[in-house]
């Protein structure tokens, strides 16, 4: 059970406000994509506030048959005692793009913690771009996320997770003032074969996050996971060069995942804009390699 993770042992007290996981604090979202003759459609949609999805839109000029789904929250952020769950299921030969409306803010906490579980299933020859906006942990927030992926060997997942250092420009600045951020990602093939598990825990009060070998002078961290067949991964690994540019405030590189699962990219930046640009470059290269399609022009407000 996610709430019993060892790193949460010191945060088991109940909030004085609404009880943990009560109505309005137990968000749920299920998205199911199916293939129709002309395009992929969002065939299944179950939602429980604060998580909301209205409908799929087809605004991607590079892939006009790609359903694009934006996850909305009407809560103004994730609060102490919140328990969120997201399920995304792609049937064989489907394609989808899922993102969030804006950054996810983990609000300041004085009791308990917040969790989010993500369960993603990809059928044969399916393709999913899951690229949410950044996570911004506020002062004394505690957040644990667990992502479970079941993927067919012929499918592709582009998964991005961006963690900000906090509210950098709030007051005198909140850099690494949160209590806990924990994220676990596990992937397995549809036959049950485990591919890899990655987990990172950040507890700024227990160690200097800005030390050399951790964040250093950077304030934005992105974990971008590309699960794709080996032929795609091999070509991308040879064509995407690492970058270290302190003048632009950006550094990133790639490594191979175990069991020929794909590639793992780590991106670090001083601000979110160069990190977003790096994500877009990797995303565009992966899409071109796997689907043959290009990305549309970036939105002016992106």
Swiss-Prot record:
UniProt GO MF annotations: nickel cation binding
Subcellular location: Cytoplasm
Matches recorded under InterPro entries: UreD (IPR002669)
Coiled-coil intervals: none
GO cellular component: cytoplasm
Keyword list, A-Z: Chaperone, Cytoplasm, Nickel insertion
Subunit structure: UreD, UreF and UreG form a complex that acts as a GTP-hydrolysis-dependent molecular chaperone, activating the urease apoprotein by helping to assemble the nickel containing metallocenter of UreC. The UreE protein probably delivers the nickel.
Annotated function: Required for maturation of urease via the functional incorporation of the urease nickel metallocenter.
Name the record gives this protein: Urease accessory protein UreD 2
Protein encoded by which gene: ureD2
């Amino acid at each position: 059970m996610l709430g019993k993770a060892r790193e949460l042992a010191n945060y088991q007290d109940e909030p004085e406000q609404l009880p943990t996981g009560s109505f309005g604090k137990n968000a749920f979202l299920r998205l199911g994509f199916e293939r129709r003759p002309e395009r992929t459609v969002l065939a299944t949609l179950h939602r429980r506030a604060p998580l909301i999805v209205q409908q799929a839109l087809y605004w991607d000029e590079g892939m006009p048959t790609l359903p694009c789904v934006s996850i909305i929250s009407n809560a103004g952020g994730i609060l102490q005692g919140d328990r969120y769950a997201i399920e995304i299921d792609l049937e064989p030969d489907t394609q989808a793009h899922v993102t969030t409306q804006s950054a996810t803010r983990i609000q300041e906490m004085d009791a308990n913690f917040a969790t989010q579980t993500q369960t993603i299933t990809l059928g044969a020859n399916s393709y999913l771009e899951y690229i949410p906006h950044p996570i911004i942990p506020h002062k004394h927030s505690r957040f644990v996320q667990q992502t479970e992926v079941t993927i067919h060997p012929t499918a592709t997942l582009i998964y991005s997770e961006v963690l900000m250092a906090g509210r950098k420009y709030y007051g005198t600045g909140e850099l690494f003032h949160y209590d806990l951020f924990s994220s676990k990602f596990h992937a397995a093939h549809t036959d049950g074969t485990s591919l890899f598990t990655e987990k990172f825990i950040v507890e700024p009060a227990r160690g200097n996050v800005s030390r050399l070998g951790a964040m250093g002078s950077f304030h934005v961290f992105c974990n971008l996971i590309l699960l794709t067949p080996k032929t795609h991964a091999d070509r991308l690994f040879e064509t995407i060069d690492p970058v270290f540019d302190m003048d632009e405030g950006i550094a990133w590189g790639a490594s191979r995942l175990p069991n020929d699962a794909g590639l793992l990219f780590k991106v670090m930046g001083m601000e979110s804009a160069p990190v977003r640009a790096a994500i877009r470059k990797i995303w565009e290269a992966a899409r071109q390699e796997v689907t043959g399609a290009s990305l549309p022009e970036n939105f002016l407000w992106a």
